[in-house]
Amino acid sequence: MSTIAEAFSTLGFTYTDELKGVGGEVPNWRSIQDVQYLKRKFRYDNQRKVWEAPLCMDTILEMPNWCRGGLDIQEGTKLNCENAIMELSMHEEEVFDKWSKVIDKAYAKATGDHLDINTYRGYAQERYLEYYM
């Protein structure tokens, strides 16, 4: 971690680890599972043998609550909900199953429409094709 802080320093930035260090100190190293960057942690998917970088749950669950100005409110909300569900697919399958249903049900209740969403494995396949092929 200290090499990251040094590299940021050469660019005129001050790197602060997400834990804010102990007494302002940045640890020399940490396991990748202990690192968080821009609200993303790292987890290894043993079944697929790949690393994922899931966004923190609080951020994902906030996504449907916001809509950019200039967008149709329903279409903007739909896109945010679908993006939130895609982000959920980088978490464990049980997390995806639980929260994707909650989000889709809430959207359907509010609009009478359903989201265009993929399955857990479908999102994994999309990522594989996009990043590894």
At which residue positions do the language-model features occur?
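Active-site and adjacent loop segments of nucleotide-processing enzymes
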Residues: 2-6, 10-14, 19, 24-133
